[in-house]
Amino acid sequence: MNQPPSLSPAAAEDLRPVVFVVDDEPMLLELNAVILEPLGLRVRTFRDPDTAVRAFQLANPRPALIVTDYAMHTMNGMDLISACRRLQPQQKIIMVSGTVDETIFRNSPERPDFFLAKPYQSKQLTEMVRSLLEL
């Protein structure tokens, strides 16, 4: 009986959904990667939102999800959302912030799919990710 060919570990790795995490705080980048990787996701972290936007422009396929901070040095999270959604209008995005609340996004056409106030529990983030990516 013929069995389907098995994927090499590298090929299986490539099939996992990619998540971009964007935050100018290195410790939070690391923490979010530790939280998200066990969900079977490939996590790419970016300290600089401009670099994240350039990576998004070149990504094929696009990331399944972006988790971004709001307040960053060179670009805020809303500008990052706008830049990414110009290329991928249905891009799934979670915004995190310790400086603003979600009321500022309610009437924005660029509002994120979910908002998470800092500090947050890892369970809150994983539940949002599972919901958006249907994991």
List the predicted regions and their residue ranges.
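Non-catalytic signal-transmission and effector/linker regions of two-component phosphorelay proteins
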Residues: 1-20, 30-33, 54-57, 61-62, ...
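Two-component/phosphorelay signaling modules centered on CheY-like receiver
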Residues: 26-44, 132
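Acidic, metal-coordinating helix/loop segments flanking the phosphotransfer/catalytic sites
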Residues: 45-65, 105
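Active-site residues of response regulator receiver
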Residues: 69
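Receiver (REC) domain active-site loop signature in two-component systems and cognate sites
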Residues: 72
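Hydrophobic/aromatic residues positioned on beta-strands within the core alpha/beta folds
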Residues: 95-96
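A Lys-centered signature of the CheY-like receiver
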Residues: 118
